[in-house]
Amino acid sequence: CSDEDLLVQIKAVISASRFYGEGYRKVWARLRLKGIRTAPRRVRRLMKEHGLQAPHQVRPAGDDQHDGTIVTERVDEMWGTDMTQTVTTEEGRAHVFVAVDHCSGELVGIHAAHGANRFEALEPIHQAVARHFGGIRGGIARDLTLRHDHGSNYMSDDFQDEIKFLGIASSPAFVRQPEGNGVAERAIRTLKENLLWVRHFATVEELRQGLLAFAETYNATWLRERHGYKTPNQIRAEQVGLEPAFTIEHKMAA
């Protein structure tokens, strides 16, 4: 098709995407999913000429995030967990917790709470274990490793004792080393850019529901370049069988 026709399709893909700042490679992949075949460099050229390129982020020297370096070949071998903060309009500060699969990038657990103690930090882990291992009982997740930082909630006896009970091996990240918590940190950055920085929530419960909806969309539509532009749900389905739909009624929302 002509450049003009392809540009129309590129703009349509960008408008339809629920994610901010996707680069030309993902736009090209989404065009392919629509049956539109073209070269990635052509998509890049048109996006550049018409001001459609994703913002380019240059990290400051000394930034030791290592996104994507601690990846696994199979799902449910290693998860990463981390937290961030946001502000609700009626209830003030809220804490957001995530758990992310290091193979597929799937948001396996997500939670919001007023506080940031070790019990709140455990919530996305409980969600994910119940969903992907079939329940909460001793040793059920014995083949899983959990990457986390050195925050007091994650290093507390209660947190460490609980994941040990579940059979999960603790893997604290080390500062200024490639074995960082970059996978979870990258997921939180995407969450901020596409939800926390662009929407307002009145209450923590409203935020929690918004996070669940975001996770459903993310797992179903976010494209993973390393896996040939497949979604987290597709990656899991290929490895372990068809995954049930992520719904608010699911255990994750409990």
Report residues per predicted region.
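RNase H-like polynucleotidyl transferase catalytic core
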Residues: Q57-A61, R142, L146-H150, K164-V183, ...
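C-terminal domain-tail junction helix/linker
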Residues: D157, K164-I168, T190-A254
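Short helix-terminating capping/connector loops at secondary-structure junctions
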Residues: Y20, I136-R142
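Conserved, non-catalytic sequence blocks in retroelement Pol enzymes and Pol-derived host proteins
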Residues: F19, L33, V71-E73, T88-E90, ...
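An active-site-proximal beta-strand-loop segment
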Residues: G80-V108, H114-A116
